[in-house]
Curated annotation (Swiss-Prot):
PANTHER family: 1-D-DEOXYXYLULOSE 5-PHOSPHATE SYNTHASE-RELATED (PTHR43322), 1-DEOXY-D-XYLULOSE-5-PHOSPHATE SYNTHASE, CHLOROPLASTIC (PTHR43322:SF5). It comes from the Bacteria. Homodimer. This is 1-deoxy-D-xylulose-5-phosphate synthase. One of its GO terms (cellular component) is cytosol. Its cofactor is Mg(2+); thiamine diphosphate. Belongs to the transketolase family. DXPS subfamily.
Amino acid sequence: MTQILSRISNPGDLQRLSATELDQLAKEIREVIIQTTSKNGGHLAPNLGVVELTLALHLVFQSPKDKIIWDVGHQSYVHKLLTGRYNHFHTLRRYKGMAGFPKRSESEHDVFNTGHSSTSISAALGFAFARDLKKEDGAVIAVIGDGALTGGIALEALNHAGHAGNDMIVVLNDNEKSIADNVGAMSTYLSRIRTDPRYFRNKEEVEEIVRRIPSIGNHVLKVMEKMKDSFKHLVVPGILFEELGFSYLGPIDGHNLSQLREVMTNACRLKGPILVHVLTKKGKGYGPAETNPSVFHGVGPFDVETGKVKKHLGPPTYTQVFSDTLLRLAREDERIVGVTAAMPDGTGMTPFARAFPSRFFDVGIAEQHAVNMSAALALQGLKPVVAIYSTFLQRAYDQVFHDVCLQRAPVVFAIDRGGIVGDDGETHHGLFDIAFLRHIPELVMMAPKDENELQHMLRTALEYEGPIAVRYPRGTGVGVTLDEELTTVPIGRGELLRQGSDVTIVAIGAMVGIAEEAADLLEAEGIRAAVVNARFVKPLDKELIIKQARETGRIVTVEEHVLAGGFGSAILELLEMEGVHCAVRRIGIPDEYVQHGSVSVLREDYGLTASNVARVARELADADRSRASIRMAPPAPIKIAFRGESR
């Protein structure tokens, strides 16, 4: 099946292959990617669309001397296969296996880590500046999709790169034809002329000859320039890039390997910033992915023959419950509007968009704009719900502070993927939102213990007259019955789920269920553990927490979030401010990035399990009962098995 691919240990091996063998290699690459993602899940459609493009890049350029930066990184699988990682490709996105995104620690060919969108052009310009300052050689290439090009940072980088004028190449992988649709003989001919260095040399020679014509030379040049500009505006879709200072080449058929090689070869001979516009088809070579590219953009395990995604039977996902509840509430209140940043499917906003198209705003990959715009919507009496992944909300931090909270604009943040998300790894885990949101004045933040509480919290958020966030995890709910009638949750009120006199376990969000399981384990040992569902990160239920601290003298906090600045830190701050002496242990994520792997495996690795919570509570209950001071657990003397402070 992989007679050629299995022999590729580095990009240089491609030079020995004939055109026929390269075509066969492209087929083998597609087959390996399809088979692997069908088992492991992953970004299938983007990678199938860049097979020929990636081959052309590695045939023309010499990685890693020539630096190729993959924007977002969704489309880096082909690159990984061509850079000596074929034998490990079966571990893609598996725990301690190959990452699903470029990773510098994985290969010298991965020159810049990516995972979030629109960063490649900035990185490429930085590499170009460094190369020129150090008087080194080597090309720099950024590969960016038309979707990622909507990101503000990408446009900022284009503006700077065009002004700076350093040699670099931006490959625009246009797989939705959102910029142009003019592929054909004329565009191919124009591209060949404009990518040939002789065009630039002849252009300069002609200009010099005309300039020497007595009296009228300069005038003729101006007329010629106007004619050229008019012609370019008529037939060349890249005039925007040329106005920014780039030489525009394209559009190019992204599945014609020989044409891609020719254009890339000519592009690397040109001076200054170059933009190569390549048209590709997402999902190329696999029928189901070509038909439904959005479904197969990021997909779980699926049946290769039928293309059907393997769905796990069970409770609805938190995203689905959010989606259904929002739709239900929006039918009752026409002031509710939905906002997302290029993630309508992932955030569950698609049903809302279909039901209320005039009340739905997909702003593209522009989180800052989404939040800023939502503040204005809220100040005009509407009820904007910004549905966004936790990791992507980081991009709009200043807007949350400056445009929403400072004005106390009643914007609802539906923060999806709060916590460990699994196989996409460190760039996608939502482990920092509590820390970067809870210290902003005026912002209320809550997290439901289950899917039923989520729907009540969404109603609460939409009735609250100020900025408010609801944080919920990826994946299925716990399987509780969903109430028909939606009620509001009192702001800042937690819930005592279980009485106990020996120790109190205070948990937030999805960790509440684990805390209850831990209490069951402790009860079997004769240890009476109280369990508190905090519900609110901010404001905390001061009365309940202080009461429990004084009654039991011991608190264990549990959060699926970093310990630094997190929920446990908020509890410690509260106890210190109120002068309450209580032994405290915090369980959460330490000061490190969490790698990729299944949610269950990673929770086990970091001690976010009932058995570990019970162990920590047991040790605390058996320890010195003195309440003279708030104590922290000592750091682990060996490699952390349960990577919280609670080792």
